[in-house]
Regions:
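N-terminal loops that bind phosphate or other acidic moieties
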Residues: 1-151, 155-186
Length: 186
């Protein structure tokens, strides 16, 4: 039984010969710094890995395999979740899989909980540059009624030559704060 979720790409690895963790981290950091999408980063990870892209099967005995997936990717493609450790699956193996949770289910659960009086779940999956996505969200909010608006997604960021600290979510939040600076009631 496997449980594979978002983040598995970073936590689970057996590198191809000639690669070290330090080299992989440097290659990943370079891609992240240049605004690469998670799909582009995971494509690189699959090329450099002995287990991603369905290659984990070579280390699994002939027993039946079940896989539960928690998706953090747009479209819930199992070959993308965790860089597809078990996908594509061999056709001659006893294999079952199911997506047990995803971004939309989490957002719907938040809305159904009614913890806050007015929660609006936005269907747009934020996947552009963090600063552009923040501006787009702020522009949208300027014309909306009072309430809580929730988006899901995974943005990108292009780092300057001398980057500061933080990550994509912090960059998004700070860009939104700057865009909201002269706006009232948001």
């Amino acid at each position: 039984l496997f449980l594979i979720s978002g983040g598995a790409s970073s936590l689970c690895e057996v590198l191809e010969d000639g690669w070290t963790l330090a080299k992989l981290q440097a290659a990943t950091q370079e891609k992240l710094a240049n605004g690469a999408s998670i799909a582009e980063i995971n494509a690189m990870r699959k090329q450099l890995s002995k287990i991603k892209g369905g290659k984990l099967w070579q280390f699994i005995s002939e027993r039946p395999v079940s896989c539960l997936l928690i998706s953090d990717v747009q479209g819930d493609n199992p070959a993308v979740i965790g860089s597809g450790l078990l996908f594509p699956a061999p056709t001659d193996r006893a294999f079952s899989w199911e997506i047990v949770a995803n971004n939309q289910q989490m957002l719907a659960a938040m809305q159904a909980s009614q913890i806050l009086p007015t929660i609006q779940i936005l269907p747009e999956f934020l996947s552009s540059d963090a600063e552009q996505a923040a501006k787009s969200c702020v522009d949208f909010l300027k014309d909306q009624a009072e309430g809580v608006y929730i988006w899901g997604g995974e943005t990108t960021v292009t780092l300057p030559a001398n980057p500061g600290r933080g990550g994509r979510n912090q960059h998004f939040a700070l860009a939104a704060a700057l865009a909201l600076e002269s706006t009232e009631n948001i």
